[in-house]
């Protein structure tokens, strides 16, 4: 809200400041005197009495006269004991006792109060609890202090439960003090105008307070108006109090929108409600009863042109005529104070500051209507009808929250029919049933379950029936027939099927309030019903409307929308980003680190940095790397800012940078991260800062806390140094930034801002000295934050008596606890926090059970999750427990969530006062042995490691994460432990990326090839074949796993060719018809085994996956993760002396069959990805080299992002990286066929000869050694023919 709005409010409330408080309106702070003990017996009354000696006059506390207390004639829930205090008093406490020397006492009761003995209101504890705790014997006294106190003349005690072996018996006392009350009554056509002191004083504090009792649901309570439409108004609208603040004429353009605040509900219940408006400096507090709304008014206190008048009860039209421009207030105001001035007293004394319009009086009339509350779906009220009349006519008013329910049923005379009036979907429906005719239905009204009073009039006579709901009339014509009124009408429900009445309520009974019931032309007096003189009833509360607004205050968090019925409320969390009964639990992970360990790849994600805290989720980019996860928050500022010379002292540029997240969200994300940084790239040409030597900063930046910073990069605060200045390598040593040198050439500074407490940058200001040709530009990068400090924050508990302690957990209305644990023990307490009687505890109760137990005053409650597998398996398990006003829930890992609803109208506040114990209990028993990690309470992370460093028996950190997160490493990747987390080692995988899940793909042009060498490259003569055979004897395979994916439209194609020094080979080809063919030749003296797999034409331009798994002679082939086929080899079981693997065109396929040679000559044109042969990943070795290369590339081979996402087969993708032509990872031309290693060429024949001789001698020696080794090994192989599987 802008300054004008604040000034309006300030001036409107302007009066000399006085020391004043609402208590000072008439009540001393010491208010606990006994009020009932001195009253005469006539001040006590009751529903009934067992005898004259058990009458209500004997119910004073600690008295023994009479029979020693009050006992009713019948002990049931419709009995009551009433006290008349003689005048309105402030009541602060009550006390109860049983009947003296008897077995008669009350164990729980309701307390109700009233001003005039009618229209009773129930006192509720903690805004929801109905009953008060009573006695457990006849003589002990139970006191209960009322918070908050209330003002009343009449009190009623209604027993709810009593000693089952006795009767109801009560002695009572009421404590409090006198209450000062100044009342003014407005009849809906009157008002009071108060003229303020016109002295131009500016008080520090402005206060207006009052109480009101409304007879109608709408009306103006107070109004103040200026000459240009400025005004404040306090208005009752549909039982809610609305505070309007308008700072200007609505007809004129204004940038200041009117402020509207709404508080309270059901305020038209004809009971007193308090209002307090406070203005302290710029802070405005608006309070209705116990509910306060705070808001900060912006601007100063400059005065506007306002009238020094304020009206109460209505808004007078110009000229002070008696005409009112809006609905005026009908009801009473009490103790009306304006900055400590008693306005009512001024009016009663006819002071000149007061002008009264209309019928204003100084006493408050008591309500005349008698409401009836239908407490349950079993409630009903049976009233006699006007038997024999030729019409049916009923009127009444009702209010409810329920969308459906039975309102009225009646039978017509002589069994001629019946009618039923009911609510369905918030609409009123009437159905008339007549013998021999189809039912007649009428619908009227809509949204009638809004808690407001609605008037209903129903009549049926001869040829028509009509229903009027408020102003909505519905008429239904009838066949002319005589309609005779029946004997009994059933309101709210039916007596029961056994009554023989024929009454049915298929939609359930009505829960709500009724009043002003008339049958025919006769008004019904519910007091006669209460006394048993009229009709009958069940589960009613007469002379009281017990409706409550369960959405005030709303327990729905994070913007969830509250809706309610009579018994409960519910929260609609759609679109909030939260879930749960009260929209408390976030749907999103807390950080990119948490997203990563869910197995999510890089991308856009919502994160909720404070979990279930008040800050909402926001969108970020998560960059998943092998070591960590980076959170990237981009700003909405310009990509680049260009600066040119300007007059000296004038800013060249002051650019602000806004972010999609709010300041609080950014602060939470930055605080959560291990490290944050933001890069500034600055380029400058002929720009300089000659005045920087005297310490005057010519450029600065503003962080999230709106503080100005002149330090750049990693420099110390206010050092005015760039990174080059710290490192001492600036281009001009007399300056601390390259761009300060003012060179006549373009220079640059790359600055990394890494002071986490100030990030992100919200503004950058650049100035210059006015050089006409100075020029510069800069680019601010996104905010980058690495990791999550809380995600791996952990502690190891080594003894059962060890624990960590923290301050008490404050989660009165909502408490959620989430953490990870791992253990090998069968039981132990994870956390415990105690109060005087309340407590909360989470424990591993058994190897397969986790239990969440607590007590908020309704008795201990437990929620248990049972698992089919043990939790003590030394793997991480995630626990999330939540307790709120709706109930409790517990979830462990992905097991079904267990829930326990809260009792209706029970205690809701969890009150804890001891220390919070983690890993143990206060008694040092049942302690937890194991690790606890990432512990959060209501979204706030606890630093376990910090506490563990100073706690005996507890160590910071936990080892062994791969047992839980190892599954994230896919496609052959291996999990490696880190101090804080895990990383995936993709060295032996055909994939890379943080989870070894990013496929490595390449486009092969026509005629290109890629060769992977399993052995060092040697050039040997044909005569040395036997020597080579011995040399490569160790590379013998009896099994191999092969995977590849491809996309092509060419046939025939060679997908993969593996050769051997023994002329053995394996080929995977696409035949001319596109079928997949596999050939194994494992014995050079036999023909190859050839297998054709007619799954489909696989040269269709689509991506296909092939997986081949050989175990000796058994080969299993799987295509596209679905089609499978098994074949048996006949040519052998050992693949000896494996030489190389070739993708694409094969120049020489010695000993290959004709089909393989044709495919080898054609090669492969298209995309290959994720190629793996055992531990060898040729594409990865070429495109992601990490050591000496074993790969030779010929022709055009270019990397692709993904085969499935690339261009069509036969053409390379546009986004490809630079192609690999004749080499991988090398610059300059490379001869075709050269291995991708840094081998020196030797052209000297002499040196070559010497080397050849040396190699020959060496090979001979090696062959002899190998032969001896083979002879020894042969004996073992003869004993066991089991082949050893190749391991990576």
Swiss-Prot record:
Residues 1267-1288 are cytoplasmic. The keyword Signal applies. The chain crosses the membrane at residues 1246-1266. Residues 585-792 form the Fibrinogen C-terminal domain. It is found in: Membrane. The keyword Transmembrane applies. It holds the Pfam family EGF. Residues 547-584, 959-997 form the EGF-like domain. This is Contactin-associated protein-like 3B. It comes from Homo sapiens (Human). The lineage of its organism: Eukaryota, Metazoa, Chordata, Craniata, Vertebrata.
